[in-house]
Regions:
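Catalytic cores of carbohydrate-active enzymes across secretory and cytosolic contexts
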Residues: 1-503
């Protein structure tokens, strides 16, 4: 579990931003929202260049502005029902409006504490991590329930799948799955039965462990809903979807409701000018009047960053020289493929005048890149992206997206109206690591990607009015649907109505 609070180093990708966006929006509109998550004292990994473009790991520290907002509220000794010692933790509270985050820092045993020092460094002993996370979070929930009524507990991702088994039956639990990818469905932690004194269902994955006991299972886009029904057909009757959203106050930089396209165009020019200043200072490169095209997200195989590599490598000199490409993203620290891909981008960044790679991707760089580029590229392999929110952050600022046919793009983009699509939409989930057909799909998708990108650059250069119209359409059409208030109303509709009645 991660939550990318402002100033924190607990950021790895879209899930952390999503959870923090929920938190901030809920706190702002008066929803008594409680988020329980680990406090990782060493944050997440950060990356930088070294000699010969080597991608090296560096420390990513929490900002003092974030740490100063944490209040120590006590400690807990966590034991299983049998009395078996699980962990000692310190608890910290982070308050924003009506929302509250309770962050736990594991102190001992040392072997368990090490699993919670860095975000996503628990892979050497995943089962111990799952057991501790469930035992700690369930104890916190029970203590909260002793003083206030809990409307529902939403379990985010499979690593917390054991939590509902430790809660009283009168506490309603729901499960939200955030990825179709295999890493999101780890094998069952059968040792938990002995350690925690619980009985688990006869299933293979932690995802199924959660799906068995929770009364509802949410996916995070319509496409993800369709894919998940096929991956987990046993639980079709429990499945629903609520498409992800963003905190508009955190991500929308174009202020107010711009009614005319001329005012919109001026606002876009100001944002781009600001981003150009940042890029030129960071890179030392001249951008001039080139179209800025960005690819910004985790560097992982299914998101297909190699489409950018192919664009830079192949005989696309005419197209390449007409644009300035910005790439930013972090690979998982255990992902050797991702690290090598990042090193490839580093080499290109050193060699090419119109390409820049920023390795230390986080909230701050995303704030400028996603909102100030001319075009965003969204390239996941079809059926692999649960939702995606980068195109939402871009769209509400009038940045259109060239997207593969996956995730929430299918609900937001109308081709040639407020953005563009490329490639094919697959109906079945394909294991891209094991199925040879994936490379053939990649080849076809890339050819269409290149064709559509060339068309878009042509429009930008020769018919600027049409390009601005499409960008303006993105701004107008995205904003109502991607507002986090819509998501909160869908997840907690009954509660929010009750809250209104009491106010």
């Amino acid at each position: 579990m991660e939550a990318a609070f402002n100033g924190s180093a607990n950021y790895a990708g879209g899930l952390g931003v999503l959870e923090a966006d929920k938190f901030y929006t809920a706190g702002r509109i008066g929803v008594p929202y409680i988020l329980i998550a680990p406090f990782y004292p060493n944050g997440y990994v950060d990356w930088d260049y070294a000699n010969k473009a080597k991608h090296v790991e560096v420390r990513h520290r929490h900002g003092f502005s974030f740490l100063s907002k944490l209040s120590y509220i006590g400690g807990l000794e966590i034991k299983a029902g049998s009395g078996r010692f699980i962990a000692d933790v310190d608890l910290y509270e982070y308050v924003y409006g009506s929302a509250k985050a309770i962050l736990y820092r594991v102190k001992r045993p040392l072997t368990t504490a090490k699993l919670f020092r860095y975000l996503y460094r628990h892979h050497r002993d995943e089962c111990t991590y799952y057991i501790a996370a469930a035992a700690i979070s369930s104890e916190i929930i029970k203590r909260i329930a002793s003083s206030i009524e809990i409307y529902t507990v939403d379990i985010q991702e499979a690593h917390l799948a054991l939590t509902p088994y430790l809660l009283p039956k009168n506490i309603k639990t729901r499960f939200v799955t955030h990825t179709p990818g295999p890493w999101g469905h780890p094998k069952i932690c059968i040792e938990a039965e002995e350690v925690l004194g619980i009985s688990l269902p006869n299933v293979k994955t932690m995802t199924e462990v959660a799906m068995e006991i929770c009364e509802k299972v949410f996916t995070v886009s319509r496409k993800h809903f369709v894919t998940t029904k096929k991956l987990f057909p046993k639980y079709v009757n429990k499945l629903e979807y609520v498409t992800n959203a963003i905190d508009l106050e955190r991500w929308r930089r174009i202020e107010g409701d711009i009614k005319d396209i001329d005012s919109f165009s001026k606002a876009r020019q100001n944002l781009k000018k600001e981003f150009i200043s940042i890029l030129q200072v960071l890179s030392g490169k001249r951008i001039e009047d080139k179209m800025i095209i960005s690819w910004c997200r985790r560097i992982v195989r299914y998101k297909r960053p190699y489409f950018i590599e192919w664009l830079l490598e192949e005989n696309n000199i005419d197209l390449r020289d007409r644009i300035f490409i910005v790439v930013s993203g972090k690979p998982h620290p255990s992902d050797e493929w991702g690290r090598k891909q990042a090193e490839t981008f580093t080499k290109f960044s050193k060699a090419l005048p119109n390409f820049y790679f920023y390795p230390s991707y986080g909230i701050e760089f995303a704030y400028y890149a996603l909102t100030s580029s001319d075009l965003l590229l969204f390239t996941p392999f079809s059926c692999w992206e649960a939702s995606g929110t980068s195109m939402m952050k871009a769209g509400v600022n009038g940045v259109p997206t060239l997207s593969s046919r996956d995730g929430a793009s299918l609900e937001l983009i109308e081709d040639n109206v407020n953005g563009w699509f490329f490639g094919v939409e697959l109906e079945e989930f394909i294991d891209i690591e094991k199925n040879d057909i994936a490379s053939k799909i990649d080849e076809k998708d890339y050819n269409d990607f290149l064709k559509r990108l060339t068309e878009i650059v042509d429009i930008y250069e020769s018919d600027k009015e049409k390009f601005i119209e499409i960008a303006y359409n993105a701004y107008k059409s995205f904003t109502p649907y991607v507002d986090m208030k819509r998501l909160l109303k869908q997840y907690y509709s009954n509660f929010i109505e009750e809250l209104k009645d009491k106010q």
